[in-house]
A protein has these predicted regions:
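Residue(s) in the substrate-gating loop at a strand-loop-helix junction
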Residues: 23
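Active-site loop immediately N-terminal to the catalytic Tyr-X3-Lys motif
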Residues: 28-34, 56-57, 96, 114
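Active-site helix of classical SDR
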Residues: 3, 39, 47
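C-terminal substrate-recognition "lid" of short-chain dehydrogenase/reductases
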Residues: 1, 97-126, 131
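Active-site loop-to-helix junction immediately N-terminal to the catalytic Tyr of the SDR YXXXK motif
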Residues: 29-37, 49, 77
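Conserved SDR Rossmann-fold cofactor-binding beta-strand/turn motif
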Residues: 60-70, 112, 125-127
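A glycine/serine/threonine-rich, flexible loop-to-helix segment
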Residues: 56, 68-93
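Alpha-helical segment proximal to the catalytic Tyr-Lys
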Residues: 8, 52-56, 117
Length: 132
């Protein structure tokens, strides 16, 4: 919905960046999270479609797919928030830690910068290796 309002401005200026946030669940689904997984998969595909449609206007569209972080949503992935459940989940992340807001922010800054001017339609997984 936000893109609907920004795209005309971006088209007029022949440049712009749209950055969406999905999740590793969109590329590597977790059990018992059907609707969550599906919504993140939709976001990834919708972003790729937007990237194809908007590239001729100089507009780039990318997605960040973070792994679970220390947020209220973490409990949805863990079930019961215990040291054992955290350890079990962390064992699926090769780098051995949850994402931090700074991890996502750094990826976002890069994708929105001129250093990423040739990147569109990409999914940047900020996930410590979870989807390997």
């Amino acid at each position: 919905l936000t893109a609907k309002h920004f795209v005309p401005y971006f088209k007029k200026n022949k440049s712009g960046v749209i950055l969406n946030i999905a999740s590793t669940a969109g590329v590597s689904p977790r059990p018992n999270l059907n609707w969550y997984n599906s919504s993140k998969g939709w976001m990834i595909l919708a972003s790729k479609t937007m990237a194809v449609e908007l590239a001729p206007f100089g507009i780039r569209v990318n997605v960040i797919n973070p792994v679970a972080g220390e947020t209220p949503l973490l409990k949805s992935f863990l079930g019961e928030d215990t040291p054992e459940m955290r350890g079990k989940f962390l064992s699926t992340i090769p780098l051995g830690r949850f994402s931090m807001p700074e991890d996502i922010a750094s990826a976002a800054l890069f994708l929105c910068s001129d250093s990423a001017s040739m990147i569109t339609g990409a999914n940047l997984e900020v996930e410590g290796g979870r989807t390997i």
